[in-house]
Amino acid sequence: MIRKFLIVLIIAYQRYISPFTAPSCRFYPSCSEYARQSLIKYGLIKGVVKTCGRLCRCHPFHPGGYDPV
C-alpha cells in the first residue's frame, strides 16, 4: 500500500513538476524513474534503500552515466 502510494507520488512528480525544472540528473534513467522502477522491482524496503543510494551518488562531482535498476 505504501509502495503504491510512493509510486503514485513519483509519477505525479514526473508529470507535473519535473517538466518545469531544469534537467539536473546525471544518470540514465533519471533518479525519479530509477526510484519508480526499484520500488516496482524490489519492493518497499529494498527499493527505498537503493533509491537513497542513487540519490547520494547524484551530485556534480560524480560522472553519472547509465545506471540500470
UniProtKB/Swiss-Prot annotation:
Domain of life: Bacteria
Keyword flag Transferase: no
UniProt source species: Syntrophotalea carbinolica (strain DSM 2380 / NBRC 103641 / GraBd1)
SMART domains attached to this UniProt entry: Haemolytic (SM01234)
Compartment(s): Cell inner membrane
One Pfam assignment: YidD
Keyword Transferase annotated: no
InterPro entries assigned: Membr_insert_effic_factor_YidD
Name of the protein: Putative membrane protein insertion efficiency factor
